[in-house]
Amino acid sequence: MINIRPDEISNIIRQQIESYDQEVQIDNVGTVLQIGDGIARVYGLEQVMAGELLEFDDSTVGIALNLENDNVGAVLMGPGLGILEGSAVRSTGKIAQVPVGDAFLGRVVNSLAKPIDGKGDIPASETRLVESMAPGIITRKSVCEPVQTGITAIDSMIPIGRGQRELIIGDRQTGKTSVAIDTIINQKTEDVICVYVAIGQKASSVAGVVSTLEDKGALGYTIIVAANADEPATLQYIAPYTGAALAEYFMYKGKATVIVYDDLTKQASAYRQMSLLLRRPPGREAYPGDVFYLHSRLLERAAKLSDALGGGSMTALPIIETQAGDVSAYIPTNVISITDGQIFLSGDLFNSGIRPAINVGISVSRVGSAAQTKAMKQVAGKLKLELAQFAELEAFSQFASDLDAATQAELARGVRLREMLKQKQNSPISVEEQVAIIYAGINGYLDTIPVSEVKGFVEKLRSYLRNSAPQFISSIQSEKKLSPENEELLKKILTDLKG
C-alpha cells in the first residue's frame, strides 16, 4: 500500500496556488472586412494607435493608417496572399522599429532592415524607431565642415557641407545617380558612413550600384536599403525612413554620415497610391494633402549636431526626377523649398557631351559656402564669374558675326573652362588636385592649349602633382589654403608642364 503524506501534497498544492499568475493578457483583436491592392479594412480594433503595427493570421505585418468611425484602414508590408475576409487581426501595441548597428555596414537590406544579399543574418546592437523625431534647434549646429563630392564643378561652385540637404534634380538618364555614387566613392578617405536608399528601382540597377561600390572599395562603409519596383507600395514608402534610422544610429555616435534617397519621386508615387486606395481626398496632381509633410519630416532628420551631442552629422542628398525639365511641378517645388539648395542636371547639356551635366546657372547651395575650404574659395569665386560671363557671351555671340579680340579671348577661355570641368563617371578628384586644375584654368594656363587637349593636360597635371610634387598636396591638406609659396610652386609646375 502506498504511503500518502498529506503534508507533502498540501505543500505541492500551496506552491501551485502561490505560483498561479492572475494576470490576464488582453489582446486587441479585429476582423478583416475587405482585402485587396495591399489595403485591408479591419473591424473591431477599438484601441489601435495611428501608425501601430498589426499582425494578420498569415504573419503578414500591416500599419494602421486610417482610423475611421467603424473601421481601420491598414496597409500591408507584404503580399498578404493568405489573408481572407473574416481573418483575425491582432494589434501589437508597437510602432514600426528597425534593428540598427555597426554590422549593417557593407550589407544590402530591405525596407524592414532584413538582409537580402544572401550573406546571412545581421547581428543588431539596438533598435530605432522608423519615424523618429528630428533634432531640435538647440541640439543643432550650423553647417561648418565640407562634404567633398570629388566632382570639381560641385565642390567649387555648389559646395555641400556636413548636415546640409542638397537636392539632385533632373530628367531621367541625366546622371543623377552617378553624382550620388561618385560622392559615396569619394568618402573613402574621409571616415564618413554612407547610406544609399533605392526606392522603386529595377533590381538590376541596384545590383549595378552594389557592384560599382564593391569594385571601388566603397561598400565597406556603405549600407544599401533597397525597395525594388516589384515590392508593395508600403515598403517603397517606408524605405527612406528606414535608411534615415540607420544613418541616425551613426550620427548620434558622433560620426559623419551621408544618405542618398534615390528617388523621392517614386516614394511620393507609392504614398499617393496608398492614400488613394485608402480613399483619402486627393489634392494637386492627385497627391494627398500631407505629401509635403511626407518629405519634410524625412529631410528635417538631416542635421549637424551640437558638440554636446558628439558633433555627428547626417547630410541628405535626395534625388527628384523631373518630366521634360519641369521644376515647377508639385513634388519638385515641394522638395526644393525643403532643401538647402539644388544641383540641376540638364538633359540638353548631357546630350551635348558635357558630363556631369550640371547647369551651374540655376544650381545653388544656400549654406555650403560656409563649409568650403579657404583654398577652394580662393579659386572658385573667379571660376563662377568667368563661367557666368561666358554663358552670357555665348548666347550673344550666336547673333553677332564680328566679335572683338577681347570677347573672342573670353569665349575661348570659357570653352576651355567648360572642358576642364568635364569628368569621367566613378573617378572623383581630390580637393587639392581640383584647386590646382581650377587655378590653371582661371589664370590663362589653358588658353593656348587646343580644346581637344585640355583633358589630357588636366590628367598630366594630376599625375605630376601625385608623383613629383606631393609636397603641394600635403601642404594644402594641412594648411587648407593656397599660400604664396604654394602658388609659386604651382606656377612653376604649370609653366614646366606647358613647356
From Swiss-Prot:
Q: Name one GO molecular function term.
A: proton-transporting ATP synthase activity, rotational mechanism
One GO cellular component term: chloroplast thylakoid membrane
Which catalytic reaction applies to this protein?
ATP + H2O + 4 H(+)(in) = ADP + phosphate + 5 H(+)(out)
Q: Per its UniProt record, what Pfam families does this chain match?
A: ATP-synt_ab (PF00006), ATP-synt_ab_C (PF00306), ATP-synt_ab_N (PF02874)
* Primary subcellular site in the record, as a coarse category: plastid
Q: Where in the cell is it found?
A: Plastid, Chloroplast thylakoid membrane
Q: How does it sit in the membrane?
A: Peripheral membrane protein
The name on file for this protein is: ATP synthase subunit alpha, chloroplastic
Name the InterPro entries on file. ATP_synth_asu-like_sf, ATP_synth_asu_C, ATP_synth_asu_C_sf, ATP_synth_F1_a_nt-bd_dom, ATP_synth_F1_asu, ATPase_a/bsu_AS, ATPase_F1/V1/A1_a/bsu_N, ATPase_F1/V1/A1_a/bsu_N_sf
State the organism named in the record.
Emiliania huxleyi
Function, as annotated:
Produces ATP from ADP in the presence of a proton gradient across the membrane. The alpha chain is a regulatory subunit.
Keyword Nucleotide-binding among UniProt keywords: yes
**Which positions does UniProt annotate for ATP binding?**
170-177
Q: What is its EC number?
A: 7.1.2.2
Question: What taxonomic classification does the UniProt entry list for its organism?
Answer: Eukaryota, Haptista, Haptophyta, Prymnesiophyceae, Isochrysidales
Site (Required for activity) found at: 363
This protein's UniProt keywords: ATP synthesis, ATP-binding, CF(1), Chloroplast, Hydrogen ion transport, Ion transport, Membrane, Nucleotide-binding, Plastid, Thylakoid, Translocase, Transport
- Oligomer status and interactors: F-type ATPases have 2 components, CF(1) - the catalytic core - and CF(0) - the membrane proton channel. CF(1) has five subunits: alpha(3), beta(3), gamma(1), delta(1), epsilon(1). CF(0) has four main subunits: a, b, b' and c.
Q: Which NCBIfam families match?
A: atpA, PRK13343.1
| Family affiliation | Belongs to the ATPase alpha/beta chains family.
- Group of enzyme by EC: translocase
